[in-house]
């Protein structure tokens, strides 16, 4: 169970780092938002899911 928690936290950190870089780039590009809207929403949905997963796994471990 601890390994699953650590992997979920690692995935959350990686996803956060990717979104931290990619979202401002998408907004700064001239046609970025209209062409990459689905990618931003998918990344955000993945991030929210990982936040809930880490919370659930944390409550099971401690």
Curated annotation (Swiss-Prot):
* Superkingdom field: Eukaryota
Query: Which UniProt key words apply to this protein?
Result: Chloroplast, Membrane, Photosynthesis, Photosystem II, Plastid, Reaction center, Thylakoid, Transmembrane, Transmembrane helix
Please name the InterPro entries in this protein's record: PSII_PsbZ, PSII_PsbZ_sf
Q: How does it sit in the membrane?
A: Multi-pass membrane protein
Q: What is its main location?
A: plastid
* Keyword flag Thylakoid: yes
- Recorded GO CC terms: chloroplast thylakoid membrane; photosystem II reaction center
Compartments (UniProt record):
Plastid, Chloroplast thylakoid membrane
Q: Which residues cross the membrane?
A: 8-28, 41-61
What is said about its interaction partners and assembly?
A: PSII is composed of 1 copy each of membrane proteins PsbA, PsbB, PsbC, PsbD, PsbE, PsbF, PsbH, PsbI, PsbJ, PsbK, PsbL, PsbM, PsbT, PsbY, PsbZ, Psb30/Ycf12, at least 3 peripheral proteins of the oxygen-evolving complex and a large number of cofactors. It forms dimeric complexes.
Q: State its role.
A: May control the interaction of photosystem II (PSII) cores with the light-harvesting antenna, regulates electron flow through the 2 photosystem reaction centers. PSII is a light-driven water plastoquinone oxidoreductase, using light energy to abstract electrons from H(2)O, generating a proton gradient subsequently used for ATP formation.
> Which family, according to the similarity comment?
Belongs to the PsbZ family.
Q: Which HAMAP family match?
A: PSII_PsbZ
Its name, as the record gives it, is: Photosystem II reaction center protein Z
Q: Which organism is it from?
A: Pisum sativum
